[in-house]
Amino acid sequence: MGEKAKANVLVFSFPIQGHINPLLQFSKRLLSKNVNVTFLTTSSTHNSILRRAITGGATALPLSFVPIDDGFEEDHPSTDTSPDYFAKFQENVSRSLSELISSMDPKPNAVVYDSCLPYVLDVCRKHPGVAAASFFTQSSTVNATYIHFLRGEFKEFQNDVVLPAMPPLKGNDLPVFLYDNNLCRPLFELISSQFVNVDDIDFFLVNSFDELEVEVLQWMKNQWPVKNIGPMIPSMYLDKRLAGDKDYGINLFNAQVNECLDWLDSKPPGSVIYVSFGSLAVLKDDQMIEVAAGLKQTGHNFLWVVRETETKKLPSNYIEDICDKGLIVNWSPQLQVLAHKSIGCFMTHCGWNSTLEALSLGVALIGMPAYSDQPTNAKFIEDVWKVGVRVKADQNGFVPKEEIVRCVGEVMEDMSEKGKEIRKNARRLMEFAREALSDGGNSDKNIDEFVAKIVR
């Protein structure tokens, strides 16, 4: 007979891969602390998630998956950003979640919810004794930048933006939706909504680690009960305390695992450029052609993730032309790839999950940000953490092939002083990431403290 669970927690993710992964990892950490966890997914993604649950991954955990009715069919486009969609989503999710909590006996001790679902706080308040823990899937730096902007503390982007506990930020260092919030108004409003009730939440959890953002974290802590609990990547790449935790456990894309790993096995250590711009980014046709030309011109081996919907943008006969110097796949097992000894650097869109994965595995970075928080992450990669370089785009946002060649040379060149410094800094942050979630590490202690506070 096992020890009685300390608490019961609902964990509710926004229904996209980049948000599901860190919240699922947090669920595993709670399970390891003897907390019962029910993972909530919207009804429109529930079945697809379970169909793709990796054998020995999520379905092997003592974890329940429960659908929350969002009012949409499973085949509803995940790219819908219309105001009507978000309004209907909020109404249905709030009702369905409240009904679930009412039906539970005993009631959950807490709901850990994606910060993009701020109305979950209102649901929790209707059920006395249920704590509300908002889980932020972006950095404290990005959180603080949005908060300063929404408070009206800066509006102009022509000159450097100077904010407390941060380096000066140019316009193209800021989250894209701040200086072009008409780019996609509903998404800007969704991201901004994360901060509407931060003064009222019980727990402010951030997927980061203390040594990564020392100054801005302290500024945040002076305002709110902010606790870093990251990096939320599988334990076997960090502290190795969760046996068998080698994968997030759920993947909405089919990775070409054997093809990637077999090809990497055939390459010398540190010789491969890994290229992936994430699950959402879409390159313009001319930019795709330029990236293809730049990678080929570097002379290095490269593994490039090009989603199936994007392959038509590749130059004709490109796959045949690169022969064995390059491998193009529709999706990769990214953690396994980044951990492979043949990887020399990671050319990335600088999404926060990808950034944390690379930092946790000590991989040097080439940043090619596109939207959302990515420019801010790229700024810190190059100028604050000094673990990589950022491509320089022209006034139209276009990156020429020569710039890709330059960046690869700076990072991959063995004799380059800058390259040596980048790799040294990457290894240093890797150690900090591992320490954070090791027994007694800052993030580990913060998770323990969260559990202790919600126990009734």
Swiss-Prot record:
GO terms for molecular function: indole-3-butyrate beta-glucosyltransferase activity. InterPro entries: UDP_glucos_trans. Transmembrane segments: none annotated. It is an enzyme of class 2 (transferase). Keywords: Glycosyltransferase, Transferase. It comes from the Eukaryota. One of its GO terms (cellular component) is cytosol. One of its GO terms (biological process) is auxin metabolic process. Optimum pH is 7.0. Its EC number is 2.4.1.-. Expressed in leaves. UDP-alpha-D-glucose binds at residues 279, 332-334, 349-357, 371-374. The keyword Glycosyltransferase applies. It holds the Pfam family UDPGT. Belongs to the UDP-glycosyltransferase family. PANTHER family: GLUCOSYL/GLUCURONOSYL TRANSFERASES, UDP-GLYCOSYLTRANSFERASE 74D1. Glucosyltransferase that glucosylates jasmonate (JA) and JA derivatives. Also active on indole-3-acetic acid (IAA), 4-coumrate, cinnamate and caffeate. This is UDP-glycosyltransferase 74D1. It comes from Arabidopsis thaliana. The lineage of its organism: Eukaryota, Viridiplantae, Streptophyta, Embryophyta, Tracheophyta.
